[in-house]
Amino acid sequence: MVSHRSDPKWEFAVVHNGIITNYKELRALLETKGFRFETETDTEAIAKLAKYIFDEHPNIDFTTLVKAVIKELQGAFGLLLKSIHFPTEVVAARKGSPLVIGVRTQRKMKVDFVDVEFGEDGPLPAEAASQNVALKKSNNLLAPPDKSLLHRSQSRAFFSEDGAPQPIEFFLSSDPSAIVEHTKKVLYLEDDDIAHIHDGQLNIHRLSKDSGASNVRAIQTIEIELQEIMKGRYDHFMQKEIFEQPESIVNAMRGRLNTENKTITLGGLKQYITTIRRCRRIIFIACGTSFHSCMAVRGVFEELTEIPISVELASDFLDRQAPVFRDDTCVFVSQSGETADSLLALRHCLERGALTVGIVNVVGSSISMMTHCGVHINAGPEIGVASTKAYTSQFVCMVMFALSLSEDRASKQARREAIMDGLGKISEQFKEILQQDQDIKNLCLKFKNQKSLLLLGRGAQHATALEGALKIKEISYLHCEAVMSGELKHGVLALVDESLPIVMILTRDSLFAKSLNAYQQVIARKGRPIVICSKGDSEFPGDKTDKIEVPQTIDVLQGLLNVIPLQLMAYWLAVAEGLNVDFPRNLAKSVTVE
């Protein structure tokens, strides 16, 4: 998120989250008008564009000015504009980037929604008409159409129950967790909304009414407790979120998994589950950690549903303009529900008639509202940029999705029941692994002053290795590469010597013998890997091998347990370097730009 001024007098100030793709053209235009830029940011172009339009038309009102600015912008953005010329007003707008408004009042509001005001179709008053004519004459800048006059009215939402006006405060943010300490009443803006705050009022405008568009924006109560976004006894949010995982996965399963009756109930999918069973293929589309969680469950979906499965990185999916058909099911996985690439891919799939499913952590997010159906992962607020508990909750929810899809397959029932039994035990097994926290911290001392690290896994554990490598790169800034064990001899083995740090995932499963072969190849080249192995495995004697033992569970869930030591390893590597664990450089929690 970036803020910038229009000039040294701060006539206009802009706070901007997103990316303006045509800012170079705007900059070139404004430079011909005599503007001098202080930075290379796209945000500065917005502020100077606002000043240019105001200088040309000093009688323009703030909302009409913002509309004229927005019409010139291409890309995705959430904007706040403030001006010394409109000292009691703030205008906010969003397009492709989240924006939420918190509302705090002393008494209960009369209604729990705000009306959306659309452009008037009738003739314009003389003042407004002349304003629009003047705008149309401005060089190289398009004016809003004549019907775009924005009218002001007092919103009925902010009266108290007895109909009397009352004091009110507004809070604007791209993330509701930043607002919860002030109020739990929030309103989510939709794309192309313009919010105008003035004189203790909030008016929401749209310049045109889309077919089927809602006439109101609901004021919702967010279910976040303040202590959930406080660190408590932990040093960092990431550490807190790692240790919350035994509870967060229980929350993901609560009311959905019945281990006694061996049933799965996913209310958000109930209406569409039979349609999904008949689909031609299932496409998982995600970015970053969410992509790795999709990779981790691909095998269980293929095994239980026998439907072709593909897993796509949203950015690559868009670059290829991959073919999507009406009988496909496209599953979008995102912690925030606002990931820009995933949202663009979602629109691509909707345009082609595919059934869309959202698996998100944030209720009311763009993905949750745009998809046909979905699952809320119930992980709770995740503050640390490096995702931990969202990964395991996504994993669990997608396994339950696969179990629900295969409910009608008689040949799969024994396997389904075994997986459900495994899910019922996973929380206690998490607690067991977390008790090794200090041992893992001590193991990380071996990586002191290292420049690179290798992570090896096979089968479903390749996804675990990918996720572990991402965590280490994100927060410790240590180069880390995840390699499929089967690919070791196809080039990567040349890197192995006694000085290269290597972590190998070698828990017992059907591929253990093949994974062990890779371990022996590393040992033969004088490598001394740290091994993540099954508890009590005699293959790796403690006096000869540095190891982290994890409980044994059913193969499709083993990745849930194996990722916990890697999360802890990433955390302690970053702490040892004195780095900002929660907010690593150059990264953002919600990636709302392409």
Predicted segments — roles?
Residues R206, S293-M295, S310-V311, A340-L343, ...:
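Extended hydrophobic-aromatic, low-complexity segments
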Residues Q245-I283, R326, R352, V363, ...:
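Active-site phosphate/pyrophosphate-binding segments
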Residues I204-K209, I219, E223-Q227, M238, ...:
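Generic C-terminus detector
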Residues M1-K231, D235-M238, E244-R280, K431-L434, ...:
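Conserved short alpha-helical segments that host acidic/polar catalytic motifs at enzyme active sites
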Residues P8, I19-T21, I84-T88, K95-L99, ...:
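Short, glycine-/Ser/Thr-/acidic-enriched flexible segments
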Residues L269, R277-K425, R458, I505-D546, ...:
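Glycine-rich phosphate-binding loops that contact phosphosugars or nucleotide phosphates
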Residues V103, R107-D112, E120-P123, Q131-L135, ...:
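Glycine-rich, anion-gripping cofactor-binding loops and their flanking helix/strand elements
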